[in-house]
Amino acid sequence: MKPSTEWWRYLAPLAVIAIIALIPVPAGLESHTWLYFAVFTGVIVGLILEPVPGAVVAMVGISIIAILSPWLLFSPEQLAQPGFKFTAKSLSWAVSGFSNSVIWLIFAAFMFGTGYEKNGLGRRIALILVKKMGHRTLFLGYAVMFSELILAPVTPSNSARGAGIIYPIIRNLPPLYQLQPNDSSSRSIGSYIMWIGIVADCVTSAIFLTAMAPNLLLIGLMKSASHATLSWGDWFLGMLPLSILLVLLVPRLAYVLYPPVLKSGDQVPRWAETELQAMGPLCSREKRMLGLMVGALVLWIFGGDYIDAAMVGYSVVALMLLLRIISWDDIVSNKAAWNVFFWLASLITLATGLNNTGFISWFGKLLAGSLSGYSPTMVMVALIVVFYLLRYFFASATAYTSALAPMMIAAALAMPEIPLPVFCLMVGAAIGLGSILTPYATGPSPIYYGSGYLPTADYWRLGAIFGLIFLVLLVITGLLWMPVVLL
C-alpha cells in the first residue's frame, strides 16, 4: 500500500494521544498516570491500524514513555526520593517484559513448532489421522479436529498451525472428488471440511495455554496487575470438561448444521497413504522430537510444583539443539518467533506500567462503585458476554487482548468476590472460542474464508451459531467446574 494513501494510519494514534492528553485529568488520578494512559491508548490504536508491524508500535510507545518518564511514568514523590535516578529506572522498566517467564515459554513453544515443521512430524500426524479416519466424511472431520488437538500444545501460532500445517493438507481433499472451489458442488465435502478446519483451530486455541500467543499475553497482563497467575496445568485442567465436550461435539454438530452431500469415499485415505509413502518411514529425529514433546507435556501438566513451565520449555529447546532436531540457525532465523517475542514482551511492559502508575487500581475503584449492588456472578457473566461480543470489532486477537483484557482484569479486581483465576481463564477461553465469530477474527480465518468453499452468508451464519453455543458452554463450565479446580 502506498504511504500517501495510508497516512491516516500513522496520524490516528498520535491524534488519540493528543486528544486524551488534552482532556482534564479525572478526579483521583495524577497527571503522569493520565498521560501514560494516553500513550498506552495510542499504542492500542496503532496495534489495531498497524501502520507498521505491531512490535514496532509497542517499542515506539515504550521509547516515548521511557524518554519522557519524569512526566509519564514516575510521580513527583518518586522523583523527589534521594538517590532516585529516573534514567536507570525507566530503562529497567522498558526492558522488564523480556524477563517475564511467559515470554520465554512462548518462545520455547515456537521452537517446538519449528521442530515439528522441519522434521515433518506435524504433517505426518495429520496424514496418519486422515488415512485412518478418512473413509467417512464425519470421521474425516474428527481427523482434522484431532490433528489440531495434537499440534496445538506445542504450536503457539494458530496461524502456523491452522494455515501452515492443516489447511495445506485439507485443501487437497475436495479435488480428489473432482470438486472445485466457488462451485455449486463445493457443498459435497469441501464446505464441511473447511468449516471444521477453522472451528478446530479456534477450539484448540482455547484448550491449551501455549496454543495461541494472546493466551500467554493474557497471563502476563494478569500477573502484572495482580501478581496472580495461571500455570499450564491450571489452564489445561480448568478447560478439561469443556475441551472434551467441544472436541467430541463440533464435528458432529457441523455435520448436522452444515451437512456434506458426500458421506463416504476411499479417495482421501488413498491420497493420504500415497503422501505418507512419499515421506518414508518415521526417522530418528521425528522419534526424538516426539519423545521430547511428550516429556514437555507431562512436566507442564504434572511438574508445576518442581519446575517452572518456562524452564521446561527452555530445557527442551536446549535438548533439541543438542540432539540436532533443530539448529542454532533455525532459532536465529525464526522471524515469527522473534516478532512475537518482541511485541509480547513490549505489551507486558506497557501493561506493567499501567498498573505501576496506579491506573488499574483507579479504574477498578471506579468500576466497583458502578457495579455495587449486583452479584459477583452476574457481573462476571456480564463482563464475559461483553468481552466475547466485542470480538466482532477486532481483526487481530493481539489487539483485542491488549485493548480489552486490562480493563476486564481491572473490573474483576474491583470486586474481590470475583475469583480472578476463574475469570481470567474464562476470558482466555473467550479469546480463542470467539475467533469463530467472523471471517477476519484471527489469522487462519481469512485463509479458510478465501478457500472458495465457505460462502459469505454461510460463514457469518455458522459463526453466530457456533459462537453462541461456545459462549453458553463456556459460561456453564466456568461457573460449575473451573472454581472446583482453580480455587
Curated annotation (Swiss-Prot):
Keyword Transmembrane appears in the UniProt entry: yes
Membrane topology summary: Multi-pass membrane protein
Reactions catalysed: (2R,3R)-tartrate(out) + succinate(in) = (2R,3R)-tartrate(in) + succinate(out)
InterPro entries cross-referenced by the UniProt entry: CitT-rel, SLC13A/DASS
Family: Belongs to the SLC13A/DASS transporter (TC 2.A.47) family. DIT1 subfamily.
Protein role: Catalyzes the uptake of tartrate in exchange for intracellular succinate. Essential for anaerobic L-tartrate fermentation.
Protein name: L-tartrate/succinate antiporter
UniProt source species: Shigella dysenteriae serotype 1 (strain Sd197)
Name of the gene encoding the protein in the UniProt record: ttdT
